[in-house]
Swiss-Prot record:
Alphabetized GO MF terms: isomerase activity
Taxonomic lineage of the native organism: Eukaryota, Fungi, Dikarya, Ascomycota, Pezizomycotina
Its job: Probable cyclase; part of the gene cluster that mediates the biosynthesis of ochratoxin A (OTA), a mycotoxin composed of a chlorinated type I polyketide dihydroisocoumarin moiety linked to L-phenylalanine, and demonstrated to have nephrotoxic, immunotoxic, genotoxic, neurotoxic, and teratogenic properties. OtaY is probably involved in the polyketide cyclization.
SUPFAM superfamilies: NTF2-like (SSF54427)
Disulfide topology: none
Top-level taxon of origin: Eukaryota
InterPro entries the UniProt entry points to: NTF2-like_dom_sf (IPR032710), SnoaL-like (IPR037401)
Protein family: Belongs to the aurE cyclase family.
An individual GO BP term: ochratoxin A biosynthetic process
Pathway stated in the Swiss-Prot or TrEMBL entry: Mycotoxin biosynthesis
EC number(s) stated in the UniProt entry for this protein: 5.-.-.-
Keyword tags: Isomerase
Protein's name in the database: Probable cyclase otaY
Length: 119
């Protein structure tokens, strides 16, 4: 299974395509999601919370720049823009999958940068 593609699809689907419901089949029912500025969330909490983020972030988009996979872990480095009204940010997501390719743990870290995203 190509976990790099799964990780990239997960991120671009929930951000650029804005399709929260269509990621559910990628998620383990007991998954945990942690983002540097938010409390930990379960799968159900993420699926309920994410549409609110999208509603408050009409210009939110992600540009994946590099993806590295090792075993069941995938690291994705991206540039994001427009999340909750913020500017351009470096974004690193560390994603861990189970043996069936379901996302079981996600940790996202972001920091603001001065540069603009490539158009």
């Amino acid at each position: 299974m190509d976990l790099k593609s799964r990780a990239e699809t997960f991120l671009t689907t929930i951000v650029n395509r804005r399709e929260t419901a269509s990621i559910e089949h990628y998620l383990h029912p007991d998954a945990q999601f942690k983002h540097n500025d938010l409390p930990s969330m379960s799968t159900a909490e993420l699926l309920a919370f994410w549409p609110q983020v999208l509603d408050e972030s009409p210009d939110f988009r992600v540009q994946i720049l590099a993806t590295i996979a090792e075993g069941l872990r995938v690291w994705v480095y991206s540039r994001v823009e427009g999340r909750l009204g913020k500017g351009v940010m470096d974004d690193v997501h560390m994603l861990e999958f189970d043996g069936n390719g379901l996302l079981i743990r996600s940790r996202g870290i972001q920091r603001e940068v001065v540069e603009e995203m490539e158009k």
